[in-house]
Amino acid sequence: MSSSTYPAAQHVMVLYTGGTIGMQASANGLAPASGFEARMRDHLHSQPELVVPQWRFREMSPLIDSANMTPAYWQQLREAVVDAVDVQGCDSVLILHGTDTLAYSAAALSFLLLGLDVPVLLTGSMQPAGVPGSDAWPNLFGALA
């Protein structure tokens, strides 16, 4: 199926891997932080004009800075994507990922997910969600819509 023939997504799985998009201040500077689903829902509720499909959320473990991405983590992502589609019935998957290695992960997943007939998108941000001027929410909700 070519990308131009995918119907609009109805049930999206959002997989959160960490990365800048969900980082928060820690004793050691910015670090991937859990609890991003609640922050995402809060932001969505504060923007009633945003129209997005139904979505579910899964926080990967461990959350990582994408500079620490590994082939083993790509396998975890593959398993999470396949589970979202085959077990949970999602018709698309959005992966929230750090920008340092996003392109490498996209390339790896393009091979690891051969034959999977749903769109898989990756997005990230240059600044954490909630930071003034951040591109996080526009990138996330632009990809989700």
Regions found by a protein language model. Name each.
Residues 2-145:
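Active-site histidine-anchored catalytic micro-motif
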